[in-house]
């Protein structure tokens, strides 16, 4: 028998071997032999690898994705005290106002929120580990330019129930907007301010959009800084003209319903929350992070005149019924910025302290040193230098060459 025959391994056996490897090692193996290169780019193997990694997630390394707002560099680091770099990817969208979201190893990018005259409605997906980039088909709502919309919103996430990545695009066209609502006028009411919104939903599996129209929507503005996608539902922070009225908007891709969730009344009284609302995934739900400075705390607060961080978790009590539970409330020392930079894989919030990072234990509420001297850049308390989120590896998009 020839030596070459001894070297040959059946494809099924190779799949069983390669599915156990991290993405970076799979890609290295794909460069060794042409047949392996083709194998790891098949949808069957990508699905096989993904399923195995999920089954062994409890023993696999945990990662964090650091998004540097200054350099637009994406760095994947190990979620441990050393926080060593695993890989990095620099991208240039030509604008500091680029919208960004990540879920299950893929990153969604868009410039549609840029107010420059040359409106760019493109939405793209990026796999930073595989260095693969996919431009999505134009959203059916891209016909509404920046000047033709009252507000727009994007969300991106992985829906494990259907094993699909989803983009939700919502537009409130000026042509359907209600007249200006004056909360102090006895002649105006929120019912008079109802308007129609257009909703586009993209599926990566089908590489297509569907369009939905919903009437009787009454949110005047949607925060575009941060969105959350959990269990097939997208969440944003919304505002009405009366600045004391803040809410969480959600779109359920299973039912195609756009709805609202009230936030605890006192949250909206803190000025900081109106400027920088922050919601993040929290297990199978979402958490609202309330950063309270000493100047906007109330006298009946336990930590009055002391900066503190509150975490409220959304509870789904029953169908169409939601409530909030305070998960944690901790005082923040003077040398720690109250701005949350992200969360670790265990849910502990990450905050900046000079050039280092600290976390707060969700069980003990005690601060812990996380990373020393992570960056040579000094921390500007008004502008976080990083946003940090849990990250998992994926081979998705590696097969796009086969589709083109």
Provide a role label for each language-model segment:
Residues 1-404:
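N-terminal entry/capping and adjacent linker segments that precede and initiate structured domains
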């Amino acid at each position: 028998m020839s030596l070459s025959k001894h070297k040959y391994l059946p494809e099924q056996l190779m799949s069983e071997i390669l599915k156990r490897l991290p993405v970076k090692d799979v890609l290295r193996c794909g460069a060794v032999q042409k047949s392996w290169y083709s194998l790891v780019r098949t949808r069957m193997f990508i699905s096989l690898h993904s399923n195995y990694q999920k089954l062994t997630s409890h023993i696999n390394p945990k990662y964090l994705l650091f998004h540097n707002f200054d350099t637009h560099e994406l760095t994947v680091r190990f979620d441990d005290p050393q926080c060593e770099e695993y890989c990095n990817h620099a991208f240039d969208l030509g604008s500091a106002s680029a919208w960004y979201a990540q879920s299950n190893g893929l990153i969604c990018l868009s410039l549609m929120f840029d107010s420059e005259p040359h409106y760019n409605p493109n939405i793209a997906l990026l796999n930073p580990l595989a260095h693969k980039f996919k431009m999505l088909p134009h959203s059916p709502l891209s016909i509404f330019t920046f000047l033709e919309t009252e507000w727009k919103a994007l969300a991106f996430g992985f829906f494990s129930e259907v094993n699909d990545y989803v983009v939700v695009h919502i537009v409130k066209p000026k042509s359907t907007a209600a007249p200006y609502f004056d909360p102090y006028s006895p002649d105006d009411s929120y019912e008079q301010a109802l308007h129609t919104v257009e909703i586009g939903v993209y599926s990566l599996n089908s590489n297509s959009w569907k369009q939905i129209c919903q009437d009787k929507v009454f949110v005047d503005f949607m925060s575009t800084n941060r969105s959350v996608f959990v269990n097939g539902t997208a969440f944003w922070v919304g505002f009405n003209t009366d600045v004391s009225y803040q809410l969480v908007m959600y779109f359920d891709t299973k039912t195609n319903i756009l709805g609202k969730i009230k936030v605890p009344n006192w949250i909206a009284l803190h000025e900081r929350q109106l400027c920088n609302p922050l919601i993040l995934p929290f297990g199978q739900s979402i958490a609202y992070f309330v950063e309270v400075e000493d100047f906007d705390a109330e006298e009946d607060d336990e930590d009055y005149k002391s900066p503190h961080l509150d975490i409220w978790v959304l509870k789904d009590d029953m169908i169409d019924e939601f409530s909030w539970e305070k998960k944690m409330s901790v005082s923040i020392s003077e040398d720690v910025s109250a701005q949350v930079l992200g969360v670790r894989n265990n849910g502990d919030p990450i905050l900046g302290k000079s050039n280092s990072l600290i976390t707060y234990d969700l069980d003990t509420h005690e601060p812990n040193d996380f990373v020393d001297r992570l960056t040579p850049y000094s921390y500007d308390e008004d502008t976080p230098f990083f946003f940090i989120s849990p990250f998992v590896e994926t081979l998705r998009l590696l097969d796009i060459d086969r589709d083109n």
